[in-house]
């Protein structure tokens, strides 16, 4: 989907890879994409999203969420908004899109995220990536990014 949308994934330098490994379980995957796995508590989501926003080498985030009991959909939605607001207070803002999969509860969480400025879509990975691609095409056309 990223290639189709005109986006590319960066190769993580070793220090960034190690920074993500501090937060994810050994059976997760650092690198790009980062996979924290579905059984992680809210703090893991917060820490990895925060790291992605804080590191200047990362320009945007595509969040993929699958409904879990440990971090239910609305908990995920609210923690994403919380971390975004925390970073905005520090002057850090980056494009973020989200894909949520699961049952009808992910629809509510996607709507919550959307209402708080995060383009979020239930049951689709392609749409949020296409939205991010459109943002980048516009920004390139406006001369804001290369």
Regions found by a protein language model. Give the residues of each.
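Short, glycine/charged-rich beta-strand-loop motifs at protein surfaces that mediate ligand recognition
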Residues: 67-70, 96-98
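Peripheral docking tails and interdomain loops at the edges
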Residues: 1-5, 77-146
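Short glycine-cluster motifs
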Residues: 1-66, 75
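Short Asp/Glu-rich motifs
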Residues: 21-22, 72, 108, 132
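Short, small-residue-enriched loops and turns at beta-alpha junctions
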Residues: 68-72, 103-104
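Short secondary-structure capping/turn micro-motifs that flank functional sites
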Residues: 18-19, 69, 129-130
């Amino acid at each position: 989907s990223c290639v189709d949308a005109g986006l590319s994934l960066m190769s993580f330098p070793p220090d960034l890879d190690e920074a993500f490994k501090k937060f994810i379980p050994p059976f997760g995957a650092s690198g790009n994409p980062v996979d924290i796995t579905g059984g992680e508590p809210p703090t893991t989501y917060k820490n990895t999203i925060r790291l992605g926003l804080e590191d200047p080498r990362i320009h945007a985030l595509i969040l993929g969420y699958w409904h879990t009991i440990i971090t239910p959909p609305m908990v995920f939605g609210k923690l994403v908004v919380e971390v975004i607001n925390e970073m905005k207070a520090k002057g850090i803002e980056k494009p973020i899109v989200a894909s949520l999969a699961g049952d009808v509860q992910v629809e509510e969480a996607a709507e919550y995220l959307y209402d708080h400025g995060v383009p979020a879509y239930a049951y689709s990975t392609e749409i949020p990536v296409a939205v991010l691609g459109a943002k980048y095409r516009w920004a390139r056309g406006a001369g804001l990014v290369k």
